[in-house]
Regions:
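Short, C-terminally biased terminal segments at protein or domain edges
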Residues: 1-123
Length: 123
């Protein structure tokens, strides 16, 4: 899978998360969960970018694994925001779908990199 696609999707997702943060802060007057989802949702792309310039395959796997965990945390905050009526089901489903797709792409990249490591001599 092209790393450029993942880079672009994670940036677009981060933009959506920033917009959600602004909506929650300004419209719903919510401050705690919005900061949590802002941190985790924008961290996904930041870790992907760091991983793309990793110093070693192990560093790549580590950065992408952190991005994977941040996706998981973001999914938690999205679900909580939906279940507490801060976001609509439509907003939730749309963001959840994007985040889940990102997580699958990240997981696929990790698996591919691990497989390539196992095929490389001396690893």
């Amino acid at each position: 899978m092209g790393e450029g696609i993942l880079k672009n999707k994670s940036m677009n997702f981060a933009i959506r998360i920033v917009n959600l943060y602004n909506f929650l802060k300004e419209t719903k007057q919510e401050r705690i969960m919005s900061k949590q989802i802002l941190r985790s949702g924008t961290s996904v792309g930041a870790n992907i970018r760091e991983g793309q310039f990793a110093e070693s395959p192990a560093d790549f796997i580590h950065k992408y694994s952190v991005a994977q965990k941040e996706c998981s945390e973001t999914l938690y905050w999205l679900e909580l925001l939906n279940k507490t009526n801060y976001i609509t089901t439509e907003q939730y489903v749309s963001l959840d779908t994007d985040c889940t797709e990102l997580m699958k792409m990240i997981t696929s990249s990790i698996i591919t990199r691990k497989k390539s490591l196992s095929l490389t001599p001396n690893h």
